[in-house]
C-alpha cells in the first residue's frame, strides 16, 4: 500500500493536476503530472471510471496500478502530483503491461529523480 503521505485524496489536488499539469498516454492509461512546492513529498492518485468495467474489474486495475506506483514513488521528484487515469483496455492488461506503460509515461514526463533499469 502507498504510504499515507504519498496518497492524493483531495479533489482540488486532482483538479490542479488535470488543469495545470502535463500528460502522457498509452493505449491503456494516461498519466497526468503537475508540480507543487519542492518541500512536499510526491503524491499519487488514481482514476478508474465505470467505462473500464464493473466494480471487481475496476478494483483489480486500481490494485495493480497501486502496486506499480508503490515501488516507484521513491523515484519521483519531490513536490510532484501524479494522477494515473485508467482507460478501458487496462481491464485486460497484465501487470507487466501496466508497469511498462507507467514507466514509459513517467520517464517521458521527466518525473524521475533517478533512473531505474528496465527488467
Curated annotation (Swiss-Prot):
Could you give the subunit structure recorded for this chain?
Answer: Consists of a catalytic RNA component (M1 or rnpB) and a protein subunit.
The record lists the lineage as:
Bacteria, Bacillati, Actinomycetota, Actinomycetes, Micrococcales
Query: GO biological process: any one?
Result: tRNA 5'-leader removal
Q: Which organism is it from?
A: Beutenbergia cavernae (strain ATCC BAA-8 / DSM 12333 / CCUG 43141 / JCM 11478 / NBRC 16432 / NCIMB 13614 / HKI 0122)
Keyword line: Endonuclease, Hydrolase, Nuclease, RNA-binding, tRNA processing
User: Keyword Hydrolase on this protein?
Assistant: yes
| Reactions this protein catalyses | Endonucleolytic cleavage of RNA, removing 5'-extranucleotides from tRNA precursor
Protein name, entry field? Ribonuclease P protein component
Flavoprotein as UniProt keyword: no
To which protein family does this belong? Belongs to the RnpA family.
Enumerate the Gene3D superfamilies for this protein: 3.30.230.10
**HAMAP family xrefs:** RNase_P
Please give the Gene Ontology molecular function terms for this protein: 3'-tRNA processing endoribonuclease activity; ribonuclease P activity; tRNA binding
A GO CC term assigned to this protein in UniProt: ribonuclease P complex
Amino acid at each position: 500500500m502507498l504510504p499515507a503521505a504519498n496518497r492524493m485524496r483531495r479533489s482540488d489536488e486532482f483538479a490542479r493536476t488535470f488543469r495545470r499539469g502535463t500528460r502522457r498516454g498509452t493505449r491503456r492509461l494516461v498519466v497526468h503530472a503537475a508540480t507543487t512546492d519542492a518541500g512536499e513529498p510526491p503524491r499519487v492518485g488514481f482514476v478508474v471510471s465505470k467505462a473500464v468495467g464493473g466494480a471487481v474489474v475496476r478494483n483489480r486495475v486500481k490494485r495493480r496500478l497501486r502496486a506499480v506506483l508503490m515501488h516507484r514513488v521513491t523515484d519521483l521528484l519531490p513536490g510532484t502530483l501524479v494522477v494515473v487515469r485508467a482507460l478501458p483496455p487496462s481491464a485486460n492488461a497484465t501487470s507487466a503491461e501496466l508497469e511498462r506503460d507507467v514507466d514509459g509515461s513517467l520517464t517521458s514526463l521527466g518525473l524521475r529523480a533517478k533512473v531505474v533499469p528496465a527488467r
